[in-house]
Each structure stands twice: as structure tokens, then as C-alpha cells.
């Protein structure tokens, strides 16, 4: 352990008195849980907001036959940057789960408190819902025009609640006639398992190939790679993103926006798949005898990171 002195932000600069007082209140154990939940909510908000914004351009561009509004490449990058921003901005306050799969993995493999996990998951779903509402508001004029166009073309019933319809900006659906539910399940399960392994690799403090500063990019690019390769056959990867956005779609278009049996796959299958990915990493890649010096961290910080 390094003998370098521990320097706090308050040692380097003074904050306004109102912020200093608020910090004391915020860091109190009775209040801090709300700060953690806000961080989880806002982290999910960030990547869903950027991801749905690019998805809106893609869907609307296809409906109005306007090319170059967006692309699968752009959507993948939007989600990747959103995840990167979320980790960089919010993880120091909450630990940076931003995904019910990750939270449940911490419960199972790290002893994360169950009540705290429930709070996190609710906050994560809320973040996706708020992001969806904001994207809908910002794209509302074009969404309404596209909806009216589908009605006039008598294509509303066949297109609206598909990946090619305005509701598909928010809720995830299968491409009609192009993907079966079993294949969608396979697609979701395999990719969620891989994502789980990659996240756990980034969190492994002894994994010298992925130092802490590279972790956010490592995880973000994993999501981008899956979107680039498997978004078209349908992939969700995140219960909060799927359920929060789907609930919003149902708030606008009613129960039809809930989708078919695929909705349960998109919402739930990533959970056991991620747990399997973490289990595989723990079995085949984690090594308790593998050491690594952590000179910039003290015991209190380590406890916060791994709890």
C-alpha cells in the first residue's frame, strides 16, 4: 500500500457554503440511499436517452424514406457513449450498476444488500421511463406525422408495433416473419451471457489487461459490438431499458405496445444469462491468488467499490 498522503477535494479548493452544508446532509446514512438511487436513475437515463435519440432517427428516417438520419452504427455508438458517460458521471455515487442484471449479479456473487438492490432496480426502470418520455417529447412532431402517414397508407396495424413503427423507437419487437421467438431467445441469451462476462472482467481488480481507467470503455464497446452485430435480429440486454421504455410506450399507445411473447424474453432472459456469464467468469477466469497493487486506494474506498 502506498504511503502517499490522502488528499481530499476540500484540501485543494473550497466549495460554496451551501454545497458544503448539503454534502454533510447528503452523505448521512439516512439520506445517502436516495443519492445512490438518483445516480442509478440518471445513469440509465443517459444511455437510454442517447440510444433512443439515434433509434428515433433510424425509424423515422426509414418511414419517411429519408436516408442518413441514423444507422445501426450510430445507434451502437450512441448507446456506447451513453454508457461511458453514465459510468464516468454516476458510478462514484452508486457503484455504477445501471442494469438490473448487474445489480442481481452483485446480490448473488457479492452479497449486495437485497433492499438496496430493489431500490436500484426501481430507480433504473424509472430512468429509462423518463428518458423515453423526453425523447418522445423532442421527436413528437415527426412521430405524429409518421403515425398519421401509416394510418393513411392503411399500414398502421401491420407496422406500428414492430421495429419499423414509431412504437418501435421505444419498445422492442421482433421483425414480422423474419425472426422466431426461440431464435430471439438464443440471440438474447448468448449476447447477455457474453456481456456479463465482459462486465465482470472489467470489475476484476487483478485483470491487468483491463485497468480501472479502461473499464468504462471496455464495457461500452461490448454493448456497441452486440448492437452492431445482433440488433436487427432483436436484442435487449437490459431489463431496465426494455421495461422502462416499454411501459412508456404503453402509456402512449395502450396495451398493444406491450408486444407479443417476445416482450417477456426481452425483459427477463438477460437476467439468468448475465448471471451465467458472471458464474463462468468466476469459475474459469477469477483467480484469488493473482495479485495486483492498488496504490491509490485505501481500505475504505476498496470496501465501497466491492460492496
From Swiss-Prot:
Keywords recorded for this protein, A-Z: Membrane, Repeat, Transmembrane, Transmembrane helix, Transport
Q: Which residues lie on this side of the membrane: Extracellular?
A: 62-68, 142-157, 204-216, 286-307
Q: Which GO terms describe its molecular function?
A: glycerol channel activity; water channel activity
One Gene Ontology cellular component: plasma membrane
Motif (NPA 2) positions are: 167-169
Tell me how this protein sits in the membrane.
Multi-pass membrane protein
Transmembrane segments annotated in the record for this chain:
41-61, 69-89, 121-141, 158-178, 184-203, 217-237, 265-285
Gene3D superfamilies per UniProt: Glycerol uptake facilitator protein
Predominant localisation class: membrane
**InterPro entries annotated for this entry?**
Aquaporin-like, MIP, MIP/Aquaporin
* Motif extent (NPA 1): 99-101
User: What does its record list under induction?
Assistant: Expression is reduced fourfold during ectomycorrhiza formation. Expression is highest at 15 degrees Celsius and decreases at any other temperature.
- One Pfam family matching this protein: MIP
Ribonucleoprotein in keyword set: no
Which reaction does this enzyme catalyse, per its entry? H2O(in) = H2O(out); NH4(+)(in) = NH4(+)(out); urea(in) = urea(out); glycerol(in) = glycerol(out)
Q: Where in the cell is it found?
A: Membrane
Cytoplasmic side stretches = 1-40, 90-120, 179-183, 238-264
Task: Report the protein's function.
Answer: Water channel required to facilitate the transport of water across membranes. In addition to water, also shows strong ammonium transport activity. Also enables low but statistically significant glycerol and urea permeability. May be involved in fungal nitrogen (ammonium) support of the plant host in symbiosis.
Domain comment, as recorded: Aquaporins contain two tandem repeats each containing three membrane-spanning domains and a pore-forming loop with the signature motif Asn-Pro-Ala (NPA). Lacbi1:387054 has NPC/NTA motifs which is in accordance with the fungal aquaporins (NPx and NxA).
UniProt similarity note: Belongs to the MIP/aquaporin (TC 1.A.8) family.
Q: What is this protein called?
A: Aquaporin Lacbi1:387054
